[in-house]
Amino acid sequence: MGSTSGPRLLLLLLTSLPLALGDPIYTIITPNVLRLESEEMVVLEAHEGQGDIRVSVTVHDFPAKRQVLSSETTTLNNANNYLSTVNIKIPASKEFKSEKGHKFVTVQALFGNVQVEKVVLVSLQSGYLFIQTDKTIYTPGSTVLYRIFTVDHKLLPVGQTIVVTIETPEGIDIKRDSLSSHNQFGILALSWNIPELVNMGQWKIRAHYEDAPQQVFSAEFEVKEYVLPSFEVQVEPSEKFYYIDDPNGLTVNIIARFLYGESVDGTAFVIFGVQDGDQRISLSQSLTRVPIIDGTGEATLSQGVLLNGVHYSSVNDLVGKSIYVSVTVILNSGSDMVEAERTGIPIVTSPYQIHFTKTPKFFKPAMPFDLMVYVTNPDGSPARHIPVVTEDFKVRSLTQEDGVAKLSINTPDNRNSLPITVRTEKDGIPAARQASKTMHVLPYNTQGNSKNYLHLSLPRVELKPGENLNVNFHLRTDPGYQDKIRYFTYLIMNKGKLLKVGRQPRESGQVVVVLPLTITTDFIPSFRLVAYYTLIAANGQREVVADSVWVDVKDSCVGTLVVKGGGKQDKQHRPGQQMTLEIQGERGARVGLVAVDKGVFVLNKKNKLTQRRIWDVVEKADIGCTPGSGKDFAGVFTDAGLAFKSSKGLQTPQRADLECPKPAARKRRSVQLMEKRMDKLGQYSKDVRRCCEHGMRDNPMKFSCQRRAQFIQHGDACVKAFLDCCEYIAKLRQQHSRNKPLGLARSDLDEEIIPEEDIISRSQFPESWLWTIEEFKEPDKNGISTKTMNVFLKDSITTWEILAVSLSDKKGICVADPYEVVVKQDFFIDLRLPYSVVRNEQVEIRAILYNYREAEDLKVRVELLYNPAFCSLATAKKRHQQTLTVPAKSSVPVPYIIVPLKTGLQEVEVKAAVYNHFISDGVKKTLKVVPEGMRVNKTVVTRTLDPEHKGQQGVQREEIPPADLSDQVPDTESETKILLQGTPVAQMVEDAIDGDRLKHLIQTPSGCGEQNMIGMTPTVIAVHYLDSTEQWEKFGLEKRQEALELIKKGYTQQLAFRQKNSAFAAFQDRLSSTLLTAYVVKVFAMAANLIAIDSQVLCGAVKWLILEKQKPDGVFEENGPVIHQEMIGGFKNTEEKDVSLTAFVLIALQEAKDICEPQVNSLLRSINKARDFLADYYLELKRPYTVAIAGYALALSDKLDEPFLNKLLSTAKERNRWEEPGQKLHNVEATSYALLALLVVKDFDSVPPIVRWLNEQRYYGGGYGSTQATFMVFQALAQYQKDVPDHKDLNLDVSIHLPSRSAPVRHRILWESASLLRSEETKENEGFTLIAEGKGQGTLSVVTMYHGKAKGKTTCKKFDLKVSIHPAPEPVKKPQEAKSSMVLDICTRYLGNQDATMSILDISMMTGFSPDTEDLKLLSTGVDRYISKYELNKALSNKNTLIIYLDKISHTLEDCISFKVHQYFNVGLIQPGSVKVYSYYNLDESCTRFYHPEKEDGMLNKLCHKEMCRCAEENCFMHHDEEEVTLDDRLERACEPGVDYVYKTRLLKKELSDDFDDYIMVIEQIIKSGSDEVQVGQERRFISHIKCREALKLKEGGHYLVWGVSSDLWGEKPNISYIIGKDTWVELWPDGDVCQDEENQKQCQDLANFSENMVVFGCPN
């Protein structure tokens, strides 16, 4: 810790007498943070020692010193130069695991008979946990594979129990496991299946050692619906900063490469912006389209665009901000798009920054000072080979590869603060733009101004293991004392532990001594060298002089781990091919492997486990805090992470926090048309320039300038400027014809072998594989083991990154550099599928054919294979083949239009073969097909589980109904989740009383027997409270010993007032006092836990109270009243005094019972008599004070049962205090007794308001008349701190009885896992019973998820809403990747008496459409703002949702907004979009309207090829209109297996909606009865998809013959519906006059015969 923490004073408890020469000094040095269950080195040293000195080291618990946690012995003698070490190990006990406060131990060293003792902070960290996931991003329903490496502080494998939790993006734990890494060699391989229905976002795996819950390690992974990209994009600025004066602007290079290494051809859309903290300003004028040719492109942000796009008063206001650039690259084939962003390009005045982070803050006067100057580029990367100079000392140097330059300065011989200014001297940069920085270094403080110094210096080199380092020890001291310094003691710290100690001898006259050090792998990643000497200074006092230096070592693995390819490395790998991997590592190590598709890291490259990340975690746990040195000798040790104590009282300040002190944060100061537009802007001053600029913006609604100006709320000057510029630009626009935007280039298919059956399609496309753990066996002569593995590559054409992490019991953990395996072939298919498509929605997919042959065009036959789960141009009877030419070094997209018919994962397969070559490829991928409609999450119930209070005889029974699924999409599943969570006992929000406020209670007791107790009480209770609440670090750890000495003094003094009968009085000659004696018993019983108390004294007093002062009825009497009435608290009031005195004495007897029961035979009998007396009178007591004190006495005697407890609680005022008017101290005392009583009987529910009231009194004890109140409030609060946070009274047994399961599902909810969300899923929508028993509370939530039908028109009570959509007028400005554009018009008016404030438009886009964000920005950012802001959310189903916020909606005029919407992918049957308007303040006042392009616009039909429409309709019902159907045909088909029913029906009415049509049929004849027990004349609902409306052509009033299969019956009896599907027969049944027509006579006769045959004879089978 630095000088900013701990007491400001160095605790130099120096003796006042000069030391004699040869007077030995003993020192103890330990790390100032000791870790549990970890071996820690303690350094023991004697200076001027003689003979053998036996040293015993003991570690005790702090503060009580009740336990010996570790003990070791050693001997100091001439042989070891009076320097020795012992290793101690602190076991993990439950005291250390409690989460209250920091933990400390007392390390005690006994040198012969000289004791040296130091209190040291304890860390619960048992080691490190590193978590590796197989990928960084996952889709819903996939599996996360992860490994946890369990290592100790040396990074060696350790077998321990760990707790692992999976945490949602909202921070809720949904899975928790306790696992052991024993016998696992430190590697736990685990997995977790992500549910299909899951929250998107950043999930976490959190893990901690079971005995160190505070030290949590975590790894994040993202859950998202995505498709892996086929290429990656990198954005590289030409400079890592933007120089504010640079007239050339900022250029960025765009590099786009396919994952298999080939260059991309496409188009990049680039936009720049400025970032200021969290705020982003997009520079819309910078939007440019850049061609990507052969994988590269270039975009430039000009200085003018930057300055015009931001509204700062001066250019310098931009300094300190940063530039970001967003790039979207689209392939020329249009099949794939990848986004990339580069952020944090700083805007600077100087291209460099100077840091002093690696420089000590203290110097030794007249000695060299090593200034380590760290120079960085503005992005934080090291600036290499930059000249630097110190202005005052003219010392020059050059930065090395790591950006650091060393400048050695000769410091002056004075004690003043030393300012040092460093600047860069880079050629070509003007002086004003060179970087410069000043630091002030302070002189090292010597003891007694002795001017004795030590300075460590070392050469500036990058150290690697195996190299040697010479450290120079420079000495400066009084010449007369130099010869007394015969050696330096040095210590080396690494990873928070003492690694090595030694002595470096010094010969007489040596001013510089060299210590040679060999760097080993133990020194990685850095180490601290601390050195000191000791002498007796001129003033006769013992002095310690110290210095330290922090040394960086090159980060690398401690051991070896290399992954490489075996065999020929130049060979190109092909998909599915076998390859050889060669892995080299340490013998006996285990290595975890994984191969990851590089496309994963294009989407998310965060959270990869690397060796750098491992060292970062280790460095973060370093307990040293500065780059070296210190303000004095103690500061040197403390800042290096060491605790020092000597037998002469010299010591380091107490470290009280595991974290290093944070430095105080510095406060920071905080085209022709375009040209004419800029000229116009220049006519206006800055304050109204924005109004002019917004007047020249385009308006999507085409409002007039006058109408637009009505929306401005910025004053007349703004309106005037707006109107002028608006009208100016309108005239200009009429004169300019706008250029049409360029479209994406498309390759035309040319008109113009291997058989398809012989082509084996590639079908294995995992995102990761090779998830194995291998063991290294026999090593070679160099000690390195090699493992050779033959693996078969997967089918992806990509680059695989093979990652390896090894764990060795000798060399620890090591992460290898990734090994890349490129997989490709000259000709292949890339089949691009979306993440999911909707059943029955027509969609376009693309197969891209790539030809990487050098100079040969390929003639290719490509085929989409038939799959009955889709409608496409491939059918069971006819192949869909195309022939086309793919030019050399190029690609051709082949679009396919399909209609998915079945939900689930369906296969899409495309094959291609090249004419006249033996070349082919095939790809088979799965496409996720989801049901129509919107996913609905319906909360069925939320209930509180509290069996004790809500149940009968402790059993709570909850009947849960099924969800109402009346709007469910037919032929889809629902899933019900039953969620359970415990509710832990509410812990007090308020902190207990701050220990730092109790200093006034530590006081010296004195005076008579009463005064002495008045003085001793506060000290005893303060120590008890600070021990219980673990707050000594706030108070001062060294003060505890002082307090114990005062208690000992008070105890000794009190014995003077002990009379011969063992009782106590104010003076020896006064009558013995019952109250004082009982009070002595109470205080001494508590003090017995702190100091040695003679049990004869304590128990003699107990015996006197029982034998002399207790009457036969149990009451205690007082004959020697106390003189000092201020010590008796609430006893002053004489009302009910027998009860209150008896209760007081009984409490004292109970608290002394553990000590005195063996010595006082009558103790229990006396306690019972007093208890019975109190019980007889308790219910009649009136005084709140007496009720409280007697209640505590009864509780201690197990007698505070229900009627007495009710009496206690009912006496409280507002259930939080026991109050008598005008008696604040008595009320605090009484309430404290009551709190103790409730804690004893564990009535924790009643406790919180009482503790809150006591805390609110902010009563810190002390003052006249406060003895009892002080003692009781701190006794009560200490007991509360002890009991309630550890109170774990939650034990619920919950059983769920589902009708569809044979046995109930059982869960036990305990306090330890209360926050864990337990989940049960069922696919059945059924009611069920839940039974809860036990203690505590929990929450039950039941949520059903299903696909709901799109709702029809809703009634609109408070809003009028009109929505329309029409094609955008040409010419239209649209994104290049957009296929078409339309304009959405929304007009609304509020139907109330005044305007609706804060309203919201919730707009669901049509499938395949997205809004034009530029239009939305215009609507939201102009001074004539029409909307206040908008949010665009990508929903689960390829449908965008747009939220628009409006400040108000008028109640007199229609408010209208218009914006373009662009179609990005083609869908045959476009689902309608919807617009909902509602007021933020009244969510029920909503109105919804749907919108849809009409068929005449061609959007419904333009993709529908004739055969495909036919295919889609064939799945509507069983077709029979192609050929004449005979009677036998009908009989044969109606009697096929699976046919459930045959009816003659009449269509009563049609209910048409936006996705499904309902036909209400009356059953006129049951020709064959099925599983539905329907009667003639009843109505039944027949459901059909809207795509079948035209094919069915059902007419109201018409009669129909209908039959179908049992699987098409839907719902539960009696509400069964019938789905009309491909197995449903629907035939018009002519009747009446129609049958007279000749053409219908045969059909009518056949239908009548069919009906008769079926009814009379039935089916033959």
Curated annotation (Swiss-Prot):
Modification Phosphoserine, positions: 38, 70, 302, 670, 966, 1319, 1571
Site feature (Coordinates Mg(2+) for interaction with Complement factor B Bb fragment (CFB)) residues: 1661
Disulphide linkage map: 557-814, 625-660, 691-718, 692-725, 705-726, 871-1511, 1099-1156, 1356-1487, 1387-1456, 1504-1509, 1516-1588, 1535-1659, 1635-1644
Annotated ranges, domain Anaphylatoxin-like: 691-726
Cellular-component GO terms for this entry: extracellular space
Residue ranges of domain NTR in the record: 1516-1659
Location of the region described as Disordered in the Swiss-Prot/TrEMBL record: 947-969
Region (Interaction with CFP/properdin): 1632-1657
Chain positions of cross-link Isoglutamyl cysteine thioester (Cys-Gln): 1008-1011
Site residues, Cleavage: 745-747, 1301-1302, 1318-1319
Domain of life: Eukaryota
SUPFAM superfamilies: Alpha-macroglobulin receptor domain, Anaphylotoxins (complement system), Terpenoid cyclases/Protein prenyltransferases, TIMP-like
Regions of compositional bias (Basic and acidic residues) in chain numbering: 947-960
Residues of the signal peptide: 1-22
This protein's UniProt keywords: Cleavage on pair of basic residues, Complement alternate pathway, Complement pathway, Disulfide bond, Fatty acid metabolism, Glycoprotein, Immunity, Inflammatory response, Innate immunity, Lipid metabolism, Phosphoprotein, Secreted, Signal, Thioester bond
One of the Pfam families matching this protein, by short name: MG1
UniProt PTM comment: C3 precursor is first processed by the removal of 4 Arg residues, forming two chains, beta and alpha, linked by a disulfide bond. During activation of the complement systems, the alpha chain is cleaved into C3a and C3b by the C3 convertase: C3b stays linked to the beta chain, while C3a is released in the plasma. The alpha chain is cleaved by the serine protease complement C2b component of the C3 convertase to generate C3a and C3b following activation by the classical, lectin and GZMK complement systems.
Keyword Hydrolase part of the UniProt annotation: no
Gene Ontology MF term list: C5L2 anaphylatoxin chemotactic receptor binding; endopeptidase inhibitor activity
Activity regulation: Complement activation is inhibited by VSIG4.
Stated role: Precursor of non-enzymatic components of the classical, alternative, lectin and GZMK complement pathways, which consist in a cascade of proteins that leads to phagocytosis and breakdown of pathogens and signaling that strengthens the adaptive immune system.
Subunit-structure text: In absence of complement activation, the C3 precursor is first processed by the removal of 4 Arg residues, forming two chains, beta and alpha, linked by a disulfide bond.
Record's protein name: Complement C3
Lineage: Eukaryota, Metazoa, Chordata, Craniata, Vertebrata
Gene responsible for this protein: C3
